[in-house]
Amino acid sequence: MMRLKEKYNQSIKPALVKEFDIKNPMLIPVIEKVVISVGAGELAKDQKVLQNVADTISLIAGQKAVITKAKKSVAGFKVREGFPVGVMVTLRKENMYAFLDKLISIALPRVKDFRGLSRDGFDGRGNYNFGLDEQLMFPEVEYDKILRTHGMNISIVTTAQNDKQAQKLLELIGVPFTKGK
């Protein structure tokens, strides 16, 4: 479980200090949290399907997911205030490292024709966002128990000062990026 955290402390931290010439140990980039979210859209109309999505995300994350509700009514989207619009879970500490380890070593290699994650997902502040098309790549998910397949957004929030540091941190952890750039 803590394989990734040990790897970070033993080999990644010193590599980051050496590459970016970091003097203050508090400025060494570290992953703060991982947020997994699903915008339910049409799925939100059926309470049973929405609960199934929440259960699936909870199973994948290893932590209970919360159903997010609309803050405002938007007539164009046919959404009222308080209407369920998605599911999300925020992972920190041990759960975060366990999820990242599972994502990198088990789930992503199971994706058909996977060539790596795009490098365009960095936001300029050292955070990385990417989407997955379906949840079936995770070993916990049983195909028979899914009412409808759905994708998910994954945000990796780091303390990196810029995208270059964040990208190097994620590369050293083992996130498979596409070749180039």
Curated annotation (Swiss-Prot):
Stretches of the chain forming a coiled coil according to its record: none
Any matching Pfam family: Ribosomal_L5
One GO BP: translation
Classification via Gene3D superfamilies: 3.30.1440.10
Keyword RNA-binding: yes
Keywords per UniProt: Ribonucleoprotein, Ribosomal protein, RNA-binding, rRNA-binding, tRNA-binding
GO function terms (MF aspect): rRNA binding; structural constituent of ribosome; tRNA binding
A GO cellular component annotation in the UniProt record: ribosome
NCBIfam families: PRK00010.1
Function of the molecule: This is one of the proteins that bind and probably mediate the attachment of the 5S RNA into the large ribosomal subunit, where it forms part of the central protuberance. In the 70S ribosome it contacts protein S13 of the 30S subunit (bridge B1b), connecting the 2 subunits; this bridge is implicated in subunit movement. Contacts the P site tRNA; the 5S rRNA and some of its associated proteins might help stabilize positioning of ribosome-bound tRNAs.
Subunit record text: Part of the 50S ribosomal subunit; part of the 5S rRNA/L5/L18/L25 subcomplex. Contacts the 5S rRNA and the P site tRNA. Forms a bridge to the 30S subunit in the 70S ribosome.
Family: Belongs to the universal ribosomal protein uL5 family.
Protein name: Large ribosomal subunit protein uL5
Organism: Campylobacter jejuni subsp. jejuni serotype O:2 (strain ATCC 700819 / NCTC 11168)
Lineage: Bacteria, Pseudomonadati, Campylobacterota, Epsilonproteobacteria, Campylobacterales
